[in-house]
Curated annotation (Swiss-Prot):
GO terms for cellular component: membrane; periarbuscular membrane; plasma membrane. Residues 1-542, 601-621, 679-681, 809-817 are cytoplasmic. Its EC number is 7.6.2.-. The lineage of its organism: Eukaryota, Viridiplantae, Streptophyta, Embryophyta, Tracheophyta. This is ABC transporter G family member STR. It is found in: Cell membrane. It comes from Medicago truncatula. Induction: Accumulates in roots cortical cells containing arbuscules, in a RAM1-dependent manner, upon arbuscular mycorrhizal (AM) symbiosis with Glomus versiforme. Triggered by RAM1.
Amino acid sequence: MARLERDGTNKSLESLMDSHKPGGTTTNLNQLRTQKSIPGYGLEFTNLSYSIIKKQKKDGVWINKETYLLHDISGQAIKGEIMAIMGPSGAGKSTFLDALAGRIAKGSLQGSVRIDGKPVTTSYMKMVSSYVMQDDQLFPMLTVFETFMFAAEVRLPPSISRDEKKKRVHELLNKLGLQSATHTYIGDEGRRGVSGGERRRVSIGIEIIHKPSLLFLDEPTSGLDSTSAYSVVEKIKDIAQGGSIVLMTIHQPSFRIQMLLDKITILARGRLIYMGRPDALHTHLSGFGRPVPDGENNIEYLLDVITEYDQATVGLDPLVQYQHDGHKPDPAAMTPVPKPPRTPYRRNTPASKHMISLRSQGFTAGTPQPDSSQFGLDDDDNDDDENFDNSLERRSVQTSRNIVTSGVYPRLASQFYQDFSAKDFSVWLYNGVVGTPRRPPSWTPARTPGWTPGKTPLSGPRSFVSNQHSASYQDPYYIQKTNTVVGQSMDYSATSYAPSYEEFEIEEVLDEPDLGPKYANPWLREVAVLSWRTVLNVIRTPELFASREIVLTVMALVLSTIFKNLGDTTFIDINRLLNFYIFAVCLVFFSSNDAVPSFIMERFIFIRETSHNAYRASSYVISSLIVYLPFFAVQGLTFAVITKLMLHLKSNLFNFWMILFASLITTNAYVMLVSALVPSYITGYAVVIATTALFFLTCGFFLKRTQIPAYWKWLHYISAIKYPFEGLLINEFKNNRGCYSGNKADLSPGPLGDVKPSKHHNASLPLNCLLGEDVLSTMDITMESLWYDILILLAWGVLYRFFFYLVLRFYSKNERK
């Protein structure tokens, strides 16, 4: 029931599927845009900062340096609008998008992200949002319709009938303009398929089939021509107008695309330079003192200004400070002084700094040079010689530490709260929605009277207080900034509160509502749907298993013609049997290596699909095993039948096949585990070959168990080749009362070596006679039944599959550390 309630509330968002219906909320959304956004509504982010530790060489010594990729970014994105994130290369656009989407590991991201005034957990963000990656990770052998149907099957609950899912898929195809490509394969380098623009729209479609409340897109126009790029953004605009919150990164949008954007966020070195409407950027730059020249594009001109300041001694601080509080910089700062060129032989000594100061005064034509302390620049923090990336270094760890210990937290951008200075009621409302320091749990925002636990924050009714305030609130992003905002009524820098990550986590635990099931479908249904897709891929990629079947068939024929008749009972045939069986096991092992590149290519699709709870990792592991089992059975049976009949083996055919079948299952599980751990198929091949060599060396063929040094004997017991090799020998020689005869000289050289008679050997046997048990005793095989070997082999296969699941579940996550 909880899931159905959540699905019902998502429908109230007037998403893409319902935006065209009469009586929808398009008019209401337009009214909201005219009434402006309010705190406690939409997606709010406060003081987002993210840093990493980088090793840098300074004065010949490697040191750890904290580098900020995001620094103190605050703002809001509301329903029905597109927020485009822009900036120069390395500005932190994708990092910022990942921070909002919950793709940064816990403990690394500072600040808070809220939806409708409620703090969000990573699991909740996955349930209400979708993320379209920059690379289109799709199965090339599926058609567009099949790709959408799979997304509908795993993203929509079973309460929705299959006919309804098909109807929704066709509606989505029409909305995205993919009607003509409905039954076209996605395609790849080897098979022609949809175009680049259509492929991008398919990637967007599979992420919105379940009508998410938030949609994140990383460079959706990358690699597309201008017409295709405009078409993609136009469809994204339709999605936003359906009631979703859309945030996307974009690089150098055309003028037509800029006209489709509702709000832009421009970053540089992880710092916020501008957030607001595109048509207000001209006023923003004029207020800063850098009006846009006639004929210039506003965004491109701002990027040029950013580059100019970034390469100057003053840095980006004037731009950041003006965006933060509307403080117009000193006139000297509006003409940035270029940095002197760096050379390997020149350091920033005090004398050189003095010379730079003199040059700066001359460059500004008599204008007083601003004090470096005005923008937080210290002489001791000039590390430009070592800073070779486009990220922001922490200016002063001690300063931030003093802020925390004093209880004064960094305030929000004035654009976000400047309108709350008019009345004490507004101040109280702001503190009540965003949060005040040290409030008892009973006064947390989640326990305000307007919160209804049965509905998600995005679709539930807003609180009574928020509705009262919405009529008088004015969007700070749409208002021209003035210099009289700060200090009119009170200083919010000492009272505004940005909850720390630890407090944010505690609030989540206390106030998280019942979100219903984490996944849309039960486990068995996920297995069935994933198995259906895997079968389609296997059928349309016959070379994957056909090549392995051909290899095993050809090698079975070759081995049969090389070893000829192995049914004779001479000493020479004993060594020939041992050689044949060890080669058969190794052949089966190496035939599974083709799973390395196939899974590595599929792994990126798995990460994309599971990053927002499309299905469970366990469903994926089990479904792939179910589909592959019949192919393993056929391959093992083919090899067993050919060699059994042509070589006249005395072994039991069913047991022979079962051992090969179990070997294929286990080796495939092992190769899948390796491919899940390595970054590329080249590394995967290297690891598989190296471990196979160790397994081969310690399986008991070259060195018997008693001949292996004690400190390496553990390798003998974990060898994946040991158990099938022993099982095949037991199947051939166990309970074989026939007598192998010949000269002892025929036993050496060979793998058998010196004979060690078994307990079944007695004096009544002929002089030069060896029983099958004698062969097993000589090979140090003490297992009483081959089924023990089969069970142990399958147990290793289960263990490999379990480790494979753990890697997929906990290691294969698309998040920053």
